[in-house]
Every structure is written in C-alpha cells, then in structure tokens.
Amino acid sequence: MGKYNLILSEYLSFVYNSQSAVQIPIYYSSNSELEKRCIDFHVKCVDYSKRGLSLKSLFEEYKDVIDDATLLSILSYSYDKYNAVERKLINYAKGKPLEADLTVNELDYENNKITSELFQSAEEYTDSLMDPAILTSLSSNLNAVMFWLERHSNDVADANKIYKRRLDLFIIVASTINKYGVPRHNEKYRYDYDVMKDKPYYLVTWANSAIEMLMSVFSHEDYLIAKELIVLSYSNRSTLAKLVSSPMSILVALIDINGTFITNEELELEFSDKYVKAIVPDQTFNELQEMIDNMKKAGLVDIPRMIQEWLIDCSLEKFTLMSKIYSWSFHVGFRKQKMIDAALDQLKTEYTDDVDNEMYYEYTMLIRDEIVKMLEIPVKHDDHLLQDSELAGLLSMSSASNGESRQLKFGRKTIFSTKKNMHVMDDIAHGRYTPGVIPPVNVDRPIPLGRRDVPGRRTRIIFILPYEYFIAQHAVVEKMLSYAKHTREYAEFYSQSNQLLSYGDVTRFLSSNSMVLYTDVSQWDSSQHNTQPFRKGIIMGLDMLTNMTNDPKVVHTLNLYKQTQINLMDSYVQIPDGDVIKKIQYGAVASGEKQTKAANSIANLALIKTVLSRIANKYSFITKIIRVDGDDNYAVLQFNTDVTKQMVQEVSDDVRYIYSRMNAKVKALVSTVGIEIAKRYIAGGKIFFRAGINLLNNEKRGQSTQWDQAAILYSNYIVNKLRGFETDREFILTKIIQMTSVAITGSLRLFPSERVLTTNSTFKVFDSEDFIIEYGTTDDEVYIQRAFMSLSSQKSGIADEIASSQTFKNYVSKLSDQLLVSKNTIVSKGIAVTEKAKLNSYAPVYLEKRRAQISALLTMLQKPVSFKSNKITINDILRDIKPFFVTTEANLPIQYRKFMPTLPDNVQYVIQCIGSRTYQIEDSGSKSSISKLISKYSVYKPSIEELYKVISLREREIQLYLVSLGVPLIDASTYVGSRIYSQDKYKILESYVYNLLSINYGCYQLFDFNSPDLEKLIRIPFKGKIPAVTFILHLYAKLEIINHAIKNRAWISLFCNYPKSEMIKLWKKMWNITALRSPYTSANFFQD
C-alpha cells in the first residue's frame, strides 16, 4: 500500500497531538480466518483505548493482521477542540503582515478593506464576492501546509531549497492571517459576518490562493512568480491576472518555427521540418513594451524582468518560463464582481451613428445564409426531430433553475422549488403548460440572472430564461450542431476532433508567404452593437427556411424559434442591488439560451468572413483556413509574395480599422508563426495549454459533497499537471485526507484508507499513481469492491413520494405515450428513471440520499459486510484475463518529436515512443447502426448503457424495441436478420468497454491506442472467432504496457495464451458488466 496511508497516519498524529488522542487502525481481509482476527483486533483496540491503555502490545500480538490484512480506515478519537491551528500558526507568523493598498481597484468593494467598512451590518453583508465555494476550510488548508513544512523541515540538498522557498512564502501568509486571527468557518464552510467583520474582506480567498501557489513552488523562478502574485493579489483583486497574462498574445508571434507538426489528409499529426521566420513589426514591440510598463506600474518587478530577459533571444527552450507565468497568473483566484457592475459593463458602450452599415448588412446576411445552410436539409426533408421538437425538448430538459421559486404540489407533499423539470410537471398537471406561447422578457417580466466568474476576466451575466425558450430552441440547435460537427470551420464541434487536430490545422499552412490573423471577439459577442444584426440575421434565415417546407409542424417549430429571437430583442433583466431589484433594459446578447454556443460560433464566423472580404479589396491572397473556436476566430492568409514587416503592419492596421468601422472592441493580432486563443496557444510550432484551474477556490457552489469535491480537486490537479503546473502531490493527498474524513461524533472521526479511495467502487476519489487508472484484481480489492456495491444506490423518501404522485406519473406517461408507438418497458422505465434522477438536483432529495450514503459508509468503514454480488464489474473481467498473460522485457525507441512541451516527463516519454492521437475514441455507441436507425425515426436517444442492454437481448425483443420507437417493421426485421446486427453487437460492446475504462480522459486521451509500435509488443495467438474477446485481451494488454511505461519509463512485451474453453465463458460474462459511477468518474465528466 502506497504513500497515502503513511501520510494519513502521520497527519493524524500531527493534527491530534494531545495526550487524549487515539488512532485505531481498522483492517479487513477476504480470507475468513484472517477476517476473524481483524475483528478481534478491532474489538480489543476499542476496549484498550476506552480503558486508556497503550495499543502497542496489541500491534505485536496481531502482527499477522497488520502484515497480511488490508487497512480499511483509521478511527481517530480526540477531545482537542480546534485552537490547534492558531497555536501552530504563531510559530510561522514571524514576518511583517501585508498591508492592503486600498486604492488599487476601481470598484470600491474590490479593494481589500476591513469587512465592516464594506458592509456596515450583518444584514448588508454578503460573502458572494469572496466565497471560496469549496467544502474545505482555510484552517484545514493551513494545517495541510504546516503538516508539509513540519514533515520536510529536515530535507537536504535540493529538497531543502524547496522547503526554504515554501517556508518563506508561508511566513508571509501566516503573519498576515495571524494579525487578524484565523477566520472560523460555519458548518457549511462559509464565513459569516461576525467572523469577518474585523478582518480584511478578501482574506480567506486570498489565503487559499496563496497556499495553492506556494505549494506549487519548486524552482527559484516559481518562487519569484509566486511571491509577486501572493503579495500583489492581496491588494489587487481586479486586474492582476489580466495584466500578467496579456503579453502572451504577442509573445506567441515572436518565436521562429523550426520544425513542427501539421495535420495531414488522414487527419493525423505528421512532423514537418519547415522553418518559418517570425516577422514582427516595430509597433508590435511597442505594444508589448506598453504591456510590460503597465505591469511595472502595478508593482510587478520580477515577472516583467523575466519577460524582458526572454525577449533578448526569444528562444523556444526558455519559453516554458513564459508559459509558466501565463498559467500561474490564473491562480490568484476568481474575480467576483457585483451583478450590477457585471451587467452595466455591457451597457457602457455608447451608440455611434458613425458605423459602416454596409458591413453590418453583410454580417447579417452571412449569418442568415449560414443558418439556412445549416438547416436547409432537415427542413426540406421534414426531419422528424423538427416535427416533434417539443417532445425532444422535454426529454432533454435540464433540472436547472427556471428563474423563480414556486410552490408545487406532488401528491400530499408541497414543496418550494425553482427547478425547470418540476415547473414543467406542475404546469402540465394544472393545464398551464403552453409551449406554443413564448413568454415575453420585457419590462413586465424581466429576466433573472445567473453569473459566471473566471480568473483574469470580468464577471459575466447569464440569462435564466423560462423553460419555454429551451423547448423552442432545442431541436433546431441540435440540427445546427450536427451540421457544425462535419464542418471544419467550427473547431469546437468538429467531429471527434481534439485540440491537437486544430493545432496541426494552423501550422499546416504557415510559411514565409502566409500570415495568421487571430482575434478575441468576446467583447463583440456581448456588445449592444451585435444584438440587432445578430438576431435579425437569425430571424431572416428562419423566414427563408419557413418557405422551404409545407409541413405545419416544422413551420411551427421554426416560428417558435423565431419568436424567441423577437422576444429577446426587447429584453429587460432584474438585478438585485442592495434591497431593491432593479429592472434594466439590456440590449445585448448574453449566455443562457440553448443556442448560445452555436449561434455565437455562427456569428463569429460571419464576422471574420466580413472582415476578410474587406481586406480582400486591398490585398490579393488565398484564405487557407478559417476557424472559429468559442470566443476566438483565426484565419491563415496566403499571399503571392513573401511576407515583410511592412505587410504585417499594414494588414494589422487595416484589420483593426475594419473592426472599428463596426464598432467592435476586439483584440485583433496578426502574426506569421503563432496564435493565442482562450483554449490553447501555439508558439514556436509547439502547442501549449493554460494550466489555470484553481484548486482551493471554486467558481460557484453546486450541490456536490465533500467526497465529490475531493475527486474534483484531484482531477483539477491532474489536468494542471498535464498542462505544466504542478502542485505538490503530498499536499493534494493531505487535502483528500481532510475532505474524505467522516465525523461520527464531535470527538470521533473516521478516515478512509487508500484502498477505499482508489478502488474503482462508487466511492473512488483518486488514483494511487498519477495518470494510471488501476483496476484492482486481488482478492481483497475485489472483496471491498463487492462490499461497496451492496450499498451504492440509496433511496430517498422525498424522491419516492414525488415519483409516486399523480403529477409525476402523468408526466412520465405523457412522455412515453408521445414517444412510443407500442409498449416498451425498457424505454418507459428509462424515462421514469431519468426523470427521477433529475430530482437529485432538488436539495432535500440530495441531502437525504447523501445521509443514507454516509451512514452506510460509516458502517462499512468499520466492518465491511461480505456480500455475494451477482453483478460483474470490469475488474472481474480483467481478473479473469490476467493469469493468462506472460510478461517479458522489451525495448521501444523514442521516435516522435515533442510537440507539447508542458507534459510531465513520463507521459511525454510514452507519446514519443508510441505517438499521439488526434481523435476521440467513440464511447457513446452513436456510431452503431441501431443508434442511427433509432435516430432516423425517433427523437429518443438511448444511452450507451441502454444500447448495451438492448443489443444483448433476443432478436425478437430487439425488434419489438425498435418498432415501439417508431421504426417501421420492415426496417426492424431487416436489421435483426442482417450481418449489421452482429457487427453492432461488437461495436457497442467496444464503446461500452472504452467508456468504462475512461479512455478519453486523463492522459489516456493523448496516446495512440492503435499505434503499430504498441501492437508489436503484444502476441496473442489467434483462437476461434470471438472478436469481442480478442478486443478485450488486446485492450488489457495495451493498458498494462502503457501503465508500466508511465510508471517505469520502460517497455514490456506481453504474450497471452488464452484457452478456447475460457473464451466462451468470458464472452458471456462480458454482456453483464455493471458500470460504476463514482465521484472520480463524475469529476472526469466535469472536466469535459
């Protein structure tokens, strides 16, 4: 057992260091004799500790338990009330506390004033501007740091340098906090007015960020960056991140490309040894200098100095430092503004009549034409999705807020809820459901707002529109997206591509006679000037489409969509400002519609096309690619002569002038070698990602539990690490220890062991080895997995009561009746289960399930209930396979060049040996014929789990299933009788297994699993034709080899002689694999 359990026991003796503290380890074993000893051992431990005796003699007596059984958890018992943090903190509070400069930020409340100066009373107070929104406390964070420092105070050599750097930074944090006292959190991990009133308002969120930064310090450069950001972010809560990260958009244009990867015709990355010189006009350097001067004005010293030193020779080797600075800048935390300021921000731009109306007209027409192009085919063919758009919308209705709280009756139960799905049910039950009427959002019914906070940017507002808007838009937007899926211009949606493909797209056409124009249009998307041309373009497109069909249902769908656009042209929003709710006319486009992403992409594409058509009046060039990715767009232009400084300058000036003619306040740049957009940046022909995920501050509070957040924390740590920002792993493990502990009483806590948290059960939180997903196959591992499966699904009385009410039942049967032609229990049950699952977002249901889960967990962590589960997990399959594999050492040379410099060494090594992949492996089953058949006739989308279940049924049952979903009998029987059906069986099983093995997450998504280099390390003699078995054997072998390579930087070869008799058994088993959902899998999903 790894490091975790060691850290756990050390951490417990660090935190509970008084005389009264006792730690009782609890063991379990799958061996029944040993299990009896485990139980005796536990009973005696509890008895001894009650009598105040030392447990040492027991550890001797039960050595067999400690050596051969598995640690399940540690029971910790302590009378100590928590002033421990303060006591320990004093030892570090040796420095000068920071003093906040109260004039740095434009908005008064963004200055780090004492809370009582910002909020006169508890009634006025809100923590929403500084809430860390994470279920762990500042005192825990401080404890985790001090624990690390104490553990490493005797380190030598380089390790000692790291210790000194971190200690030095922690002294700043400790001294500042100590001056005011450690703020105590309440039971919801929030900081109340009476705790904060005599302390600086941003103390907690600043300290969390500071701790996250100092625990990510390794080198001297890290130390300098961290120190500067920690000190300055104490005062500057508004613009620091923006200042520090601004130069990157220019830096990417300064490095020559000497060898790069390009996307070839097969959509694979292929090395190209081309050399492209960075052509940089003087004005660009002036702009960069201005940015650096602004940094200096804000008090930064070391960071601008590092940038200036790098500018001397602009080398790619030292560029990693630039990318480090860029990543670090996000870790100062989220900028959280008041809603009123976030909303007024968009309304500040004043109208000018001095705009180029021709350009606006062209822009609108391009939007119109694109909308028509996207929807033309489905409309002309009277696509069933557009006919049954309302049903499709209801089936995928989310359980997010509908903007207002209503009193709802479900049977005898009356509840208050804001959730869309509940409102829909209630409206249907009371005859208030009128999807054909889109409610206005004018001055009489202003839109309530949500918020989106990001580091380094202003807070943005989000419309919370009534559910009618979702229903009206859903089907049409789905069709728009499926068009975008096979259109390369839409980088974000393009079929199964990933960021690497988009990278190769850009580098492909860079040469001495081309330049790339890249623009950040986030300001334009939310500007008032965009609104009318944007909505009108969409409306005109819909009008043209309406004339292309005679189907009244399709016309109705298009008209409803049109109505949403008309309503939103006259939109008002409601903003709480102190006690009053202000109504403000809001003339801009905001997120919150179903169409937001798709429509913005269309608009941004239209925008760059408009600009390029103007540029084309003056220059002659070929547009090699145009791409739009979220808020950014970019294009590569190829001229017929080599590019000169003067050309770059002129094109740049012209582009900026053209944008200004449309009053678009955007950041447009021209370069010959690289681009920088929100999602990724390309410099020196290599691709970089910003490692800017905050660990100890969250954007908002959801309804995830401490366990979920521990998994999310780990998952964020992994993503950052892949992108080049590494936080100390021991610190992360310490946070997991804290966040997964369960309080039994005030003085009793239970801490789960590594085995519990890393086995893939419903409780999995992290991997014992970074980047490697292990599937336990030992007796003890399978035993504990089975034990956890027995208590995975928890009941909720409230949910059951709602689900048994007439309102709920009627809704579910309404959906089933509209969807199904004939009875189909799988689908009806599926709908009921889905609708019931949506109730989880209603807090009381969630809490109830959670409590049941915790109490079951507590029982389990004290003594696992052995239980024979008939469920088969992926572990069982791998366990059956494992014994038949023989390992030998092998050798695989490095043969690919690096293209992602920020990757950790071990991951980089594996990619350099076997290559990378530029596609997502299909793990949803959507590529199978049955899935396509269903979507041809029905709006129902079965999940991969359901397809997996259905495809293994008898042929007659599959046929009935298809017919009930509206597939004509002839098609259904043809399908079942054809070879396609047996191919599907294999395809779906494949997708399902990929899905279970999280092949598209973590670092596995970077590896080429079909690499011939990998294949040649595997030898499996061909026996019998069971492709599914061959598939799983190969996949297992690949994972084993890759995991071994990540761990040891060495290759192994696997030989498997799988007996024919076992193959059939295995094949049968493979059709009964249960999927396990855990905090770990949902954290992976959350990353997506």
UniProtKB/Swiss-Prot annotation:
All copies of domain RdRp catalytic, residue ranges? 501-687
Q: Name one GO biological process term.
A: viral genome replication
UniProt-listed Gene3D superfamilies: 1.10.357.80, 1.20.120.1390, 3.30.230.140, 3.30.70.2480, Viral RNA-directed RNA polymerase, 4-helical domain (1.10.10.1990)
Q: Which UniProt keywords apply?
A: Magnesium, Nucleotide-binding, Nucleotidyltransferase, RNA-binding, RNA-directed RNA polymerase, Transferase, Viral RNA replication, Virion
- What is the protein's known function? RNA-directed RNA polymerase that is involved in both transcription and genome replication. Together with VP3 capping enzyme, forms an enzyme complex positioned near the channels situated at each of the five-fold vertices of the core. Following infection, the outermost layer of the virus is lost, leaving a double-layered particle (DLP) made up of the core and VP6 shell. VP1 then catalyzes the transcription of fully conservative plus-strand genomic RNAs that are extruded through the DLP's channels into the cytoplasm where they function as mRNAs for translation of viral proteins.
* Record InterPro entries: DNA/RNA_pol_sf, RNA-dir_pol_4-hel_dom, RNA-dir_pol_luteovirus, RNA-dir_pol_reovirus, Rotavirus_VP1_C
Group of enzyme by EC = transferase
Gene Ontology CC: virion component
Instruction: Provide the assembly information.
Output: Interacts with VP3 (Potential). Interacts with VP2; this interaction activates VP1. Interacts with NSP5; this interaction is probably necessary for the formation of functional virus factories. Interacts with NSP2; this interaction is weak.
Predominant place of localization: virion
Looking at the keywords, is Disulfide bond present?
no
Natural source organism: Rotavirus A (strain RVA/Human/Japan/YO/1977/G3P1A[8])
According to its UniProt record, which protein family does this protein belong to? Belongs to the reoviridae RNA-directed RNA polymerase family.
Q: PROSITE patterns from the xrefs?
A: RDRP_DSRNA_REO
Q: Where in the cell is it found?
A: Virion
Q: What is this protein called?
A: RNA-directed RNA polymerase
Obligatory cofactor(s): Mg(2+)
The EC code for this enzyme is: 2.7.7.48
At the top level of its lineage, which domain of life is listed?
Viruses
Q: Which GO terms describe its molecular function?
A: nucleotide binding; RNA binding; RNA-directed RNA polymerase activity
Q: What is catalysed by this protein? A: RNA(n) + a ribonucleoside 5'-triphosphate = RNA(n+1) + diphosphate
Reply yes or no: does the keyword RNA-binding apply. yes
